[in-house]
Amino acid sequence: MSEVILGRTGITVNKNGFGALPIQRITKEQAAALLQQAYDGGITFFDTARAYTDSEEKLGYALSHVRSHIYLATKTAAQTADDFWKDLETSLKLLKTDCIDIYQFHNPAFCPKPGDESGLYDAALKAKEQGKIRFIGITNHRLSVAQEAIDSGLYDTLQFPFCYLATEKDLALVQGCKEQNMGFIAMKSLSGGLITNAAAAYAYADQYDNVLPIWGIQKKEELEQFLSFIKEPPAMTEPIRAMIEQDRKLLSGSFCRGC
């Protein structure tokens, strides 16, 4: 089993994070069964967002009974401190918890910092002081904002699109996070569906010891494939390497950065 430590957070999990955006599309009971199966199979990191309609509610419904054994990451797209607090209180209620492990700014157009006019980072610090969040993260699709977040030293984690179609600039972010002891959470590890070989995607991500891929899962068969990687992590074999190179030639420039 491959494990990853999310930088200075010390959070240590296997290299299979559950991306909970797709569970919006299934019923509450279907989601509960899927999430329970994920937990039973060894997945302990679950990522959601206030913007993902009822995803937080489904997570709280399904996993509140094992809260002390899992890590919850969620996000706020708030533009003001007032909306930050509203989102945070809603997320805490829906997730049925009194503390969120990683609370992330959701794809902001800028990098929130202490004392700026948005008040967002100051609100996050206050929430941390109050024990409502443990760590402050940021998610983004813009290289410039991601790099600024790394350079600032203010953030415990960065969530950014990363897969085997990544560019040298994307790889530089991974290295930057490692140097800053900052967790790197990889969204879109299948490039929004462009990549169809999950084993190859896993093998690629597994080469980077500080990268935690989160997989968007809504079907039992998808989950079972990723659970199989916990017991037998796919290796970067020559056939997989050749397939990746072929995909890079065919799909270069198509890497999905949007939602």
Task: Label the model's feature ranges.
Residues 108-258:
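Beta/alpha (TIM)-barrel catalytic core signal, keyed to glycine-rich beta->alpha loops juxtaposed to Asp/Glu
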Residues 1-70:
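N-terminal binding-site loop/beta-alpha segment at the start of enzyme catalytic domains
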Residues 25-38, 81-96, 140-150, 196-202:
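Short, acidic/polar
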Residues 56-75, 122-131, 179-182:
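Alpha-helix-loop-beta-strand connector modules within alpha/beta enzyme cores
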Residues 92-112:
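Active-site groove signature of glycoside hydrolases
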